[in-house]
Amino acid sequence: MKGEIAVRYTIRHFDLPLLTFEANMDSADTDLHIIKVYEENRSFLPLNLTVSEDGVERWLRHRTIPKNRAYVDALLSKVGLSLNRPLGIIAANKGLSLNDCFWVDAEGSGDTFEKVNLYDNRFSQVLAAIAFTGYGSSIRTSLASCPEFSTNGMLPKCWRRQNGKIYLYKGGTSRFSNLGFEPYSEMYAYQVAQVMGVNAIRYTLTKDLKKTLCSKCELFTSKEYSYIPIGQLVSKGGMKAIFEYYQTLGRTFVDALEDMLVFDAIICNTDRHYGNFGVLVDNKTNTIAAPAPLFDHGNSLFSLGGTDLWDNQKAFDEYARTLLPLAYDDFFAAAKSAMKPRHRAMLHKLLDFHFDRRATRYNLPPNRLKMIEKEVQRRARVLLW
């Protein structure tokens, strides 16, 4: 960082100082130097942070908008930021996230967690609109008011506060006739989870944001409980290593993992990855408290299936056979190895499964919905017999 102006920043948990580092956040060189670790507060360091300069940099990068997010370039350009300066994004949005209560405080800022946190303070509706649509004018505002900068995932999305609660609005993919059905799958997958008794986030459908169909779900984190994706706790070894890790946490965690594998086999979830399941952390103690509820099921229930499938059983069956899980080899093999007696009871409830068409004004065409229902029933039979 020779010849550049380095600034000191402190990673805080609420207002508790944890680690101070020095970096030039506007430089292409992301080199940073740890100045101090507050040993008396070490137990409150993020569980997914390795105390090293590379580890701090990785942790910071996890708190920036992903490069594959829809409209990411439009959003950043409107506020004068660049994907090529990820630490610059951190400096601008203070590393705030709706996943937890950590943040990055610049030396001498005078800020407090109460003043800047995303759980209590207003969001920028202008930035939310740009994040969701890609359209909008360049603006000058505090980026600390925009949770979109630290939200993962590639689909267009934004957060809104309504009646004292925080909701995530998420759109679908676009451009081709077989795309854009992810919001439906989010809602219908929740219905399957309800019948099975699996702990999953409730999704509804709405067009109250720019008249675009999108899914809507309530935030499941808070100032009391935060979320850590399992991939930030178990970095290698795949599902085998994750099972072993969950066994160290207790039976409740193993049960949740087994439920997830059976559920994903039923809904044919091709996008379960190490970033969209994990654990909840008690923010008072900074210790793992419970498995996180399941969420992010837009790439399930054949949401990418072409229009030629829904009146052609043979074509649909051939298509369904091509769909594979992302994080392990085979849906049914993984589910059967995880199954316990309780799962048989869950699966029996699906043998005559039907979606609740009265739950929303927005449903898939009847032929498509009927085909998916039949496949849910079939997949339950495969696991039972």
Indicate residue ranges for each PLM-predicted region:
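Phosphate/dinucleotide-binding and metal-coordinating scaffold of catalytic cores
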Residues: 1-262, 266-268, 280-385
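Conserved protein-kinase catalytic-loop segment immediately C-terminal to the catalytic Asp
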Residues: 273, 278-280
